[in-house]
């Protein structure tokens, strides 16, 4: 436990854990030994229930299964041993299918927990490494930066303005200031200011800490058992499926009760009617619906992870299909976040000059004293550091690591042949950059004198300046005319899409010397333009939010294909809004603005909150991207919060619903497509299950009402249930995303799953199935007596209908011939397995006795195939008619329009 280290000094802590406060652990053998002793740095989940126990519980959890058991027992009492064995076998099969479904659902959900491994920065043998947090051991030296999640209990050994949010552990909302000073022992958790606790979040500053407890030995580990006992809430879709299941169950039970009563009054065998009634209840009630929904959602999430979009919460999958506004950061999401200085301006120049593309700039190329002063300020006001190339996780060839702007500036300094000045200038203090401040400043010591350096947005830097230096480094008073000249050059550079960074230095922080401007290029990501236009075609607005100047933002938005007019004045007036302008708007004006504005410039994370709230008040379903600590509230407020996997802080990732592992906007399009596709698949298998349920109930009901003998026996009905709830239904949930899915507008937030159109399709399919099946039954029963052959033909007819109906339900709008009949591998296996099972039921002697069937000829099979394929052909005609009438928007039409 970490409590003993409160009173230890830094030196005592290092001595006790045999580590070094600067170099960390140095022996790989010792790290391995400590890992064996203390185990991985994760929280162990309690042992799960034995699979055998889980399986046996299936027999008692469903009242209908218990009723079937009772029916089997009554059959034994009456001497009908064959019937009793048949029913018992059917129970085992039904329960096994249900168990496999639930087990698969649990395993799929479990796999989701492993999608987001957590990493941390650790110093070992004096070198910084980026490792999986679970591999930390006591004694490791961990680097903490703003936005990090603390990976273990740490004794702080170095802190610079370090503040940590401990609300998830202590309940206190205000971040706690941390220091390295030893404190008295036996104090409360909230007063332990030299310990950073596992799972808490760095809100401000930076520091280092030595691991003093890992895994279950941490303070967070002590409360983990309580967290384990909390059951995860179901998603809205799962709840609606539960409600739908209950409603259908009630309707089915009423219908079944009527069927059984009619049978009794007609003088049919009461035990047979009871068994058929219970079997119908098992078949008609879609108890597998919520499970298949869960499996479909979970497998869809796993599929998204392969496309670099990690969904952290299942309900988000449902929301993705409803998103109609995406608010995206510019840097790193719409652009590459690989920044390069391409232009430099210093006072006295007529215009900024462009840097050549060569790696090293010749000394003769404009190497003035003014540029050297600007480069010195940019390099000193900089937190980039040399990157450990052995670190494979960061996946970069750049020799520097840090914020992209810092890296661009230090690389520019290197290109001019300047050595890193931070080795000779000793930093005294730092004011970190934030999106609210829009600047960073440092105080340094050099030759016993103190100097201040500043970099940031031009307006912030200029407001702190009283002087400027010319190209020769000579200092002059900053006049209004020179300010205007600086701002004109900033505007011209920004108009070409460059991010502008101003630099200054001086002794007095309120009277700094302005040195110049750096124009930094951050090119758009590949495929972003196509993604933006594709989303807009599908009814999704794309809004760009950036801290850049409005001129830079407009230029970038236009290059990305957003709906921005070519005239800059009109674009700025009607399609762009700055953070300052946004603050001046009342709620009504803000709602009007967000309904038309495409670009928000010079914004802060607080502005993001206002934008989300205004859009939601208009009824929009909003996705918002973010990567910083202060973005977290907006990410939580948005319907879909999207964090960056590479550049994003742990705080942002904790608040987000989705994480982009490649930070690319194009990945959002893939996720929205997948979300819509998953919802389509859910509608398709609901259509399949409902049409089969309605057909089975209607078949028995019509037979009872018209006094026919039962066309299906209890065992056959249970077999149909296995097919309806089993592999064919599940295989519909993994159908590939339809390429036309983005042509459909976003789904309204509260739109019911069972629409009028879906219900019409269900009733049409059920009508065809029931009509043809009754015709087959009546044709076979010409002598008035029901034989094994009659029920076999009827039973096989219904099963074939199931298979063709499943094939038709693979897509609501697209022909199966365009999809490719064999394009869904799981569907092929499911249908193939079902047909093999049906062949065994009809032709294998042991199963013939159980299901009361007999072999039928090839001619019979061909006739049945011809009859049952009607459900597919009718659905194909329906799809063709909708396409012919232009009721279906397709991607091919979109591409033709844009040729």
Swiss-Prot record:
One of its GO terms (biological process) is manganese ion transport. The chain crosses the membrane at residues 59-79, 80-100, 247-267, 282-302, 688-708, 757-777, 827-847, 854-874. CDD domains: P-type_ATPase_SPCA (cd02085). It catalyses: Ca(2+)(in) + ATP + H2O = Ca(2+)(out) + ADP + phosphate + H(+). SUPFAM superfamilies: Calcium ATPase, transduction domain A (SSF81653), Calcium ATPase, transmembrane domain M (SSF81665), HAD-like (SSF56784), Metal cation-transporting ATPase, ATP-binding domain N (SSF81660). Its EC number is 7.2.2.10. It is found in: Endoplasmic reticulum membrane. Keywords: ATP-binding, Calcium, Calcium transport, Endoplasmic reticulum, Ion transport, Manganese, Membrane, Nucleotide-binding, Phosphoprotein, Translocase, Transmembrane, Transmembrane helix, Transport. GO terms for cellular component: endoplasmic reticulum; endoplasmic reticulum membrane; Golgi membrane; nuclear envelope; plasma membrane. InterPro entries: ATPase_P-typ_cation-transptr_C, ATPase_P-typ_cation-transptr_N, ATPase_P-typ_cyto_dom_N, ATPase_P-typ_P_site, ATPase_P-typ_TM_dom_sf, ATPase_P-typ_transduc_dom_A_sf, HAD-like_sf, HAD_sf. It comes from the Eukaryota. It is a multi-pass membrane protein. The modification Phosphoserine is found at residue 892. Gene3D superfamilies: Calcium-transporting ATPase, cytoplasmic domain N (3.40.1110.10), Calcium-transporting ATPase, cytoplasmic transduction domain A (2.70.150.10), Calcium-transporting ATPase, transmembrane domain (1.20.1110.10), HAD superfamily/HAD-like (3.40.50.1000). Its main location: endoplasmic reticulum. Pfam families: Cation_ATPase, Cation_ATPase_C, Cation_ATPase_N, E1-E2_ATPase, Hydrolase. The active site is at 329 (4-aspartylphosphate intermediate). One of its GO terms (molecular function) is ABC-type manganese transporter activity. Belongs to the cation transport ATPase (P-type) (TC 3.A.3) family. Transports calcium and manganese ions into the cell. Regulates cell morphogenesis through control of manganese and calcium homeostasis. This is Calcium-transporting ATPase 1.
């Amino acid at each position: 436990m970490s409590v003993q280290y409160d009173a230890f000094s830094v030196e005592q802590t290092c001595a006790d854990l045999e580590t070094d406060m600067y170099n960390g652990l140095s022996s790989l053998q010792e790290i391995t030994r400590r890992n064996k002793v203390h185990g991985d740095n994760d929280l162990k989940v309690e042992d799960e229930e034995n699979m055998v126990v889980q399986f046996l519980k299936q027999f008692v959890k469903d009242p209908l299964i218990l009723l079937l058991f009772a029916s089997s027992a009554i059959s034994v009492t009456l001497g009908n041993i064959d019937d009793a064995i048949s029913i018992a076998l059917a129970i085992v099969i039904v329960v096994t299918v249900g168990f496999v479904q639930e087990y698969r659902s649990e395993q799929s959900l479990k796999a989701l927990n492993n999608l987001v491994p957590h990493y941390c920065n650790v110093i070992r043998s004096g070198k910084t490494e980026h490792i999986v947090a679970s591999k930390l051991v006591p004694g490791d030296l961990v680097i903490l930066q703003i936005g990090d999640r603390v990976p273990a209990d740490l004794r702080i050994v170095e802190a610079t303005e370090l503040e940590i949010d401990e609300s998830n552990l202590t309940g206190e909302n205000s971040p706690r200031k941390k220091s390295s000073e030893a404190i008295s022992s036996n104090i409360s958790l909230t007063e332990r200011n030299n310990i950073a606790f596992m799972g808490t979040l760095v809100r401000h500053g930076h520091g280092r800490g030595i691991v003093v407890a890992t895994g279950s030995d941490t303070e967070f580990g002590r409360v983990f058992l309580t967290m384990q006992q909390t059951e995860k809430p179901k998603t809205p879709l799962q709840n609606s499926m539960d409600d739908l299941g209950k409603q259908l169950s009630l309707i089915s039970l009423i219908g079944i009760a009527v069927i059984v009563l009619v049978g009794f009054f007609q003088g049919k065998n009461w035990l047979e009617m009871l068994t058929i009634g219970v079997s119908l209840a098992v078949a008609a009630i879609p108890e597998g619906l919520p499970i298949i929904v869960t499996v479909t959602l979970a497998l869809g999430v796993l599929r998204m992870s392969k496309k670099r979009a990690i969904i952290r919460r299942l309900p988000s999958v449902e929301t993705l299909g409803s998103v109609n506004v995406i608010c995206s950061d510019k840097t790193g999401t719409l652009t590459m976040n690989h920044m390069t200085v391409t232009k430099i301006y210093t006072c006295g120049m007529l215009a900024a000059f462009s840097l050549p593309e060569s790696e090293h700039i010749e000394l003769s190329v404009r190497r003035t004293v003014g540029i050297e002063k600007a480069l010195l300020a940019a390099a000193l006001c900089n937190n980039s550091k040399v990157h450990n190339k052995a670190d494979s996780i960061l996946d970069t060839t750049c020799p520097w690591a840090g914020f992209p702007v810092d890296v661009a500036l230090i690389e520019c300094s290197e290109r001019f042949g300047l050595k890193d000045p931070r080795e000779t200038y000793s930093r005294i203090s730092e004011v970190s950059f934030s999106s609210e401040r829009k600047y960073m400043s440092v105080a340094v010591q050099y030759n016993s004198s103190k100097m201040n350096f500043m970099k940031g947005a031009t307006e912030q830097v200029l407001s702190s300046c009283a002087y400027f230096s010319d190209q020769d480094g000579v200092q002059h008073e900053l006049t209004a005319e020179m300010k205007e000249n600086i701002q004109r050059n900033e505007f011209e550079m920004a108009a070409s899409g460059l991010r502008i960074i101003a630099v200054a230095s001086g002794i007095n922080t309120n009277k700094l010397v302005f040195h110049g401007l750096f124009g930094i290029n951050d090119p758009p990501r590949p495929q972003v333009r196509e993604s933006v236009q594709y989303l807009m075609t599908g009814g999704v607005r794309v809004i760009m939010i950036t801290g850049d100047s409005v001129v830079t933002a407009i230029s970038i938005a236009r290059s990305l294909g957003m709906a921005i007019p070519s005239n800059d004045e009109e674009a700025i007036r009607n399609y762009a809004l700055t953070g300052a302008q946004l603050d001046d708007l009342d709620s009504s004006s803000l709602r009007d603005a967000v309904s038309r504005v495409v670009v928000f410039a010079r914004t802060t994370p607080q502005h993001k909150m206002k934008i989300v709230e205004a859009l939601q008040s208009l009824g929009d379903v909003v996705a918002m991207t973010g990567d910083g600590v202060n973005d977290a509230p907006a990410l939580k407020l948005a319907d879909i919060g999207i964090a960056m996997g590479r550049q994003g802080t742990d705080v942002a990732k904790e608040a987000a619903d989705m994480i982009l592992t490649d930070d690319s906007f194009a990945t959002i399009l893939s996720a929205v497509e997948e979300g819509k596709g998953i919802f389509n698949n859910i509608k398709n298998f609901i259509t399949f299950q409902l049409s089969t349920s309605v057909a089975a109930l209607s078949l028995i009901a019509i037979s009872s009402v018209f006094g026919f003998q039962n066309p299906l026996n209890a065992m056959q009905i249970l077999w149909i249930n296995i097919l309806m709830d089993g592999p064919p239904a599940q295989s519909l949930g993994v159908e590939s995303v339809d390429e036309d899915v983005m042509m459909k507008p976003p789904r309204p937030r509260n739109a019911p799953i069972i629409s009028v159109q879906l219900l019409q399709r269900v009733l049409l399919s059920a009508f065809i199935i029931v009509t043809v099946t009754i015709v087959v039954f009546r044709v076979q029963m010409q002598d008035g007596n029901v034989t094994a052959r009659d029920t076999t033909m009827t039973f096989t007819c219904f099963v074939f209908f199931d298979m063709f109906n499943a094939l038709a339900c693979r897509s609501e709008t697209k022909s199966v011939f365009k999809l490719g009949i064999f394009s869904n591998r799981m569907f092929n296996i499911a249908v193939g397995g079902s047909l093999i099972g049906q062949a065994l039921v009809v032709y294998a002697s042991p199963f013939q006795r159980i299901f009361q069937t007999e072999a039928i000829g090839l001619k019979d099979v061909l006739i049945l195939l011809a009859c049952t394929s009607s459900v597919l052909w009718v659905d194909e005609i329906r799809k063709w008619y909708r396409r012919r009438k232009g009721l279906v928007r397709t991607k091919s039409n979109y591409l033709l329009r844009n040729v």
